[in-house]
Amino acid sequence: MINYEVFVGNTSYTALIKQEIQQLTLCMNHQGVSAGNLVAIAIHEPISWLVAYYACKELEAVPVVIGKVAELDKQLEIVRADYVCYTSDHYKIQIESLSVVKERNIPSNTGLICRTSGSTVGMPKYVAWSKEGITYQKQETTRVFGYKEGERLLFTLPLWGAYGLSIVGVLEHNSMDLVIPANLRPRSIITVLEKQNVCWVESAPFFYQTMLPYLFKEQRGIEEIGVKGWGCGGDLLTHTFVQQWVEMTGVPILDGYGLTEAGPNVSLNRPYDYCYGTVGKPLSGTEINFSEDRELWVRSPSVMLGYYANGQVDASMLHNGWLSTGDMATRDEHGYVTILGRKKNIIIVNGYNVSPEYVERTIREHPGIRDVAVVGVPHPTRGNRLCAFVVGDASLTKRDIDLFIKDKVDEPSRPSFYEIIPHLPVLPNGKTDRNQLKAIAEVRFGQESLV
């Protein structure tokens, strides 16, 4: 049974959740759900998701966390679960038996199966986490942050993503309370932080990029609220932005790094040991290494058992327990890790390899820019040209940005096109949806790139 309080805004849902867990557990038991069965949870609304998740745990079934998907039937074909939980009208949870799976081979220590973020135009993969890895993540993350029983944590992202699942693990390990914001309006967030005595906040860059302008506008310092740590997953915030945040709140934003395949946390900044512009130091027990092209490799107790599909767990991509992350990174002499960008995101411009994350970090230092994403627009002879989608002040012009970065990056790294937009599209885990932006750029600038 769930061992912590749950609030939406200032309203407690704990009693309702516990009651519905009991009811769903009885219903699942009546349907024949038993230990080791795979139960797909195709729910995105947080309260109903918690009910289904903990009902699975009561019966020692293995949750297969699908979350919000457009084509559920296709996902069910991939995961080959024994049962599926979903919500009908008015968030009523349904449990349905699926066709009998005759052939399935998954390790006996599988504790959970979750999916990678995918994108709006890409199919996600499913990852099997071990019971031991889940326990390791709970214990090590608790050790890093010093969480205490009864403290309250505000979380703004989906619980069914890898980030959310790690938060749920920490909450149950420490009997901490979960606060889900009723909305993301800055004034409402501050009210909830005050009334709920929130100690920890976990979110993504878009949350902080919304909050900081409000704090400046209202000239509102929030040191007195008492938040111990502001965590950030997804993409990195700039050094300048974090400094401005500290000026207004008195507490740094703690960037970290993880990926679903690693269980998820790999490296974290600590409240007592952090370095701006980095993702902190690896967890104790987590090993990291670098290939010749600076790709980051990880080995830890929580690295996935393998990718799961069609009743099988495939661990062929692991090499003696080492996971290729696909991210380029460095580690300095003090042990802090810096993520340079995704290897697969590299854009070839006139024969040069350009990291869009490097260009983005440079552009973000402009005082009038809140966020940016850079993608490639195909060109028949030059490989690609760069297009920067910029979120910034209304007075911002393309010439302003060009002049700002002219002497800061080499010529291949300078965008040919700029598009000023109100906000960047994001995936459920808070990361920028680059596939969507690339599709927009090709439609908007594809013909222009031919000249």
Set out the residue ranges of the language-model regions.
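Gly/Ser/Thr-rich phosphate-binding loop
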Residues: 198-203, 212-274, 287
